[in-house]
């Protein structure tokens, strides 16, 4: 894919703040097909984006400083993927510019929705544009992989069948369904899931040509789900309740559960029945990232 470009008239000085979405993702299924010698797991999964997520406000500065103006509770700025992504691109491109970044955080941490990876990808794509560093999507994805296995899918921005550690992507076209996404009152450690002895690691590999784009919730599974529900009764209880209303599955390593509905009205009807303590939202699955819709249409006067 071609590198992002900006008009030559935007070539110096501080910029205004620009708004960039940082969408959530779903793993419509997640199969673990092996483990590499370096300890990383070989995965097969289908990623789809959600028309819902965090929002980042980003501006370019003539100072080389990377300044996150809205720190996230419990996460130091230096360990935040937002700051790490900006500094990594700055280092690799040797740009003289810096950035000021604000985030409106709505995606839960420890939910399996890819919030941190999405934030990192949004920063890489936005600053590549604002700094005019002209890296290609493939180059940005290589940088992103240093930050997390899910970052490349957010860089490329299309629904995909992913293999390897999640970096080998083949476009797919799942139905853009309506989902109710619900979060139990717990957070799941991805590291704890992937280091658990009870985690299945030998699911048979799929033939991508035979993948059914319409039946992800019936023909496939999430290898992490049984492990998580056995250790987290909050997840087990919520999942058991949701499947009475719609096909439902945990995304990623959890804890969020997505339920597919035929209409927004029906999804919101079930959402209204959830206990107030369960955070949830209704949205649509989309096969192009909302971030890329902004990047592709952004014009600066």
Descriptions of predicted regions:
Residues 156, 160-247, 260-301:
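Conserved, helical-rich catalytic subdomain that frames metal- and/or nucleotide-binding sites
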Residues 28, 56-58, 82, 116, ...:
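Residue-level signal for inorganic ion chemistry
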Residues 5, 83-98, 125, 218-237, ...:
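A short, flexible low-complexity segment enriched in Lys/Arg and Gly/Pro that occurs
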Residues 98, 124-161:
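Contiguous, small/hydrophobic- and glycine-enriched helical/loop subdomains that border
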Residues 2-110, 129-138, 165, 173, ...:
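ATP-binding N-lobe of GHMP and related small-molecule kinases
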Residues 62-75, 145, 212-221:
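Short, basic/glycine-rich phosphate-binding loops at helix/coil junctions
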Residues 102-131, 247-261:
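Glycine/serine-rich anion-binding loops at beta->alpha junctions
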Residues 49, 145-146, 153-155, 170-175, ...:
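Solvent-exposed alpha-helices and their adjacent loops that cap or buttress functional pockets
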């Amino acid at each position: 894919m071609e590198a992002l470009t900006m008009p030559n008239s935007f070539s110096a000085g501080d910029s205004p703040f620009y708004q960039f979405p940082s969408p959530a993702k779903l793993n419509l299924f997640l199969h673990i097909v092996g483990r590499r010698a370096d300890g990383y797991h070989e995965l097969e999964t289908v990623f789809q984006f959600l028309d819902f997520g965090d929002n980042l406000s980003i501006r370019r500065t003539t100072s080389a400083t990377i300044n996150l103006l809205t720190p996230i509770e419990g996460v130091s700025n230096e360990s935040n993927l937002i700051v790490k992504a900006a500094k990594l691109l700055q280092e690799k491109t040797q740009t003289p510019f810096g950035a000021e970044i604000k985030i409106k955080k709505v995606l839960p941490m420890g939910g399996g929705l890819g919030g941190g990876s999405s934030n990192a990808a949004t920063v890489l794509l936005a600053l590549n544009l604002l700094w005019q560093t002209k890296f290609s999507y493939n180059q940005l994805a290589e940088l992103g992989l240093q930050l997390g296995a899910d970052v490349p899918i957010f860089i490329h921005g299309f629904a995909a069948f992913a293999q390897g550690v999640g970096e080998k992507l083949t476009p797919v076209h799942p139905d853009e369904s309506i989902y109710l996404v619900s979060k139990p009152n717990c957070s799941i450690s991805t590291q704890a899931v992937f280091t658990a002895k009870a985690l299945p690691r030998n699911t048979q590999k799929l033939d991508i040509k035979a993948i059914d784009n319409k039946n992800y919730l019936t023909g496939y599974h999430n290898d992490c789900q049984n492990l998580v529900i056995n250790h987290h009764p909050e997840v087990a209880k919520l999942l058991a309740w949701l499947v009475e209303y719609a096909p439902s599955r945990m995304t990623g390593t959890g804890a969020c559960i997505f339920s597919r509905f035929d209409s927004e009205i029906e999804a919101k009807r079930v959402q209204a029945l959830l206990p107030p303590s369960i955070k949830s939202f209704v949205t649509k699955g989309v096969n192009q990232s909302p971030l890329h819709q902004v990047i592709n249409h952004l014009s600066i006067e």
